[in-house]
């Protein structure tokens, strides 16, 4: 190949066209966009499932689902698994992580582009398997926790739970491969001059999350494989009549399950740090403290799992340890909350939609954190365990908290991804509808839990009817807000104004704002040099 043809070859971006561009893509931006589109689709499906069982719970009597309480449990299971594994993780970790980590560190792409492709398509396959399981033998009505004996052959004799287990295996594999890719990218492909402590906090949050996934996911894989062999190959890991112990499954599941909570929320912490710094026009307060807080949250998150199991008969010493350990997690989390507030303090603050969602996140996450401190007390948890108080707590933290950070990131970066800037008034309307809807849904559930209403039941005494109706109305408003969000996306893509390279002004000082909107197919082929 002579010099002229080489130059021509390098001058062309060789962007593939049509469906092959997406199916075979190894470009981190295309794969990030596919993750985000998939997450929005899965979120709508999971949200519709929750609306169905909120309609069932709107009034006592169990009439909406025609007394099909197995279907109710299948909806609960599918809603939880979809929202955790197919909505929040693909949006925050897969979507924004894939798209923006290489841009934020000045890398040309991810370290392993083909691995990136299979990570995404494994997730789609897992989603199809999970949806299919709902139509097999009555569906998996176990809850997302898959506790035996309900998930054993005695509780679910058909193939539904086996399909759900394979779905979880595939989504776990997808997450692990994506994590390896991101860790290698962050450690090996930073631009010259960008030390670890010059990286934006979003990159740090993805790095910590990736390590959590690699350490936690194999434990889930082991637990559900043992469950699979109990169901199909005559082992007795969790069958008491064969010398097994169902509580062992709970230990294994929650050793994964509690770090999973931080896997869900940590990338959101990173997004909020970027957004608040940008719109306060100040560097983040206590950068190294914020990094340290994330690392400590990740570490302590692994050693408090049994606070999900305070009522299974743990020893007195174990109760003391897990109560104290759980309360300690509030310290690094508090460091982050107060650092965000300190960043805003004295800043030149503006309030576009991403900033509203970030402030909404701080409010919601703080409410959820306070109820978490109450639940961390094993004595109080004896009363509150498996009531709607717990439902309210974890929705305020990992659900609403993570959702609001995802919306903050979406509005913050949508112009950069698409080249079209959303109309600010539409974004603000979306924020207020969502904020009112989710609070109307979940705040009354604190009262229901304190009054003694248990989780995972399709019918209830009339004493609980009032707040359940309020909660169901809130769910309807929240679903309307989600559909309105989809409308905003399509409206912006069709009628939105062209987005400048940096729509946010001086506060946005990370590398992605030096590129065009949308960025070219290949970026940073010559690495930028970071100074200062």
Swiss-Prot record:
Keyword Metal-binding attributed: yes
Signal peptide (residue range): none
Pfam family, one: COX1
Binding site residues for Cu cation: 258, 262, 307-308
GO cellular component: plasma membrane; respiratory chain complex IV
Subcellular location as annotated: Cell membrane
Keyword Iron found: yes
UniProt-listed Enzyme Commission number(s): 7.1.1.9
Entry binding sites for heme a3: 393
Stated name of the protein: Probable cytochrome c oxidase subunit 1
Species lineage: Bacteria, Pseudomonadati, Pseudomonadota, Alphaproteobacteria, Rickettsiales
